A protein has these predicted regions:
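Cytosolic regulatory regions of ion transport systems
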Residues: 1-182
Length: 182
């Protein structure tokens, strides 16, 4: 899969390295030329491009039309919205994933701005804390499809009813709306 990531900070770089390790074709765009050069030196196998991902010409030069996924992972919400909109509207990228830095801005990250999936690190951590405190064994990892679906982690305690502990997942009768992922 061809993935273009905008933002060479710690988040964007970590994602780029993980996806590269999984044999995806990854391009990492970083607007700070000096920092982009540093990334190239530190990670010689990583395709790093020194360019401003908010500029149409830079995205065109990075061949966004051939991207399967664009990840807007800069530290600036406004930049991430511009990148998402350009990726979806101007380059018809099938999947756009966007980082939300300030959870107060979450309402903006929707299909109108070209966002397919938004990830808010502050909201995710807050949710993990809230769920761990309130429920204990069910953790809401993230909302998907603009709140229509949730990715949750369920951990059964050793004191859970044997009917749950002694069955495989395929033997459990799960609601048709439930999907198990690993």
């Amino acid at each position: 899969m061809r993935v273009v990531i905008a933002g060479g900070g710690s988040v964007g770089t970590a994602i780029a390295l993980d996806l590269t390790d999984r044999n995806h074709d990854v391009t990492l765009m970083e607007q700070n030329t000096g920092f982009a050069e540093k990334l190239k030196t530190q990670h010689p196998g990583l395709n790093v491009v020194a360019a401003d991902a908010c500029e149409y010409a830079s995205l065109s030069a990075a061949d966004l039309r051939s991207a399967d996924v664009v990840i807007a992972a800069t530290g600036d919400d406004e930049d991430n919205l511009v990148i998402s909109w350009l990726a979806k509207q101007e380059f018809a990228v099938p999947r756009v994933i966007t980082r939300i830095n300030n959870s107060r801005n979450a309402w903006l990250f929707n299909e109108a701005w070209g966002v397919d999936v938004s990830v808010s690190t502050p909201a995710l951590i807050t949710s993990l804390v809230d769920e761990a405190v309130e429920v204990g064994s069910i953790i809401n990892l993230m909302d998907l499809a603009h709140g229509k679906m949730r990715l949750i982690e369920v951990t059964l305690a050793s004191t859970a009813p044997a009917v749950l502990l002694d069955q495989s997942l395929e033997d459990l009768r799960l609601d048709g709306a439930v999907r198990v992922v690993a």
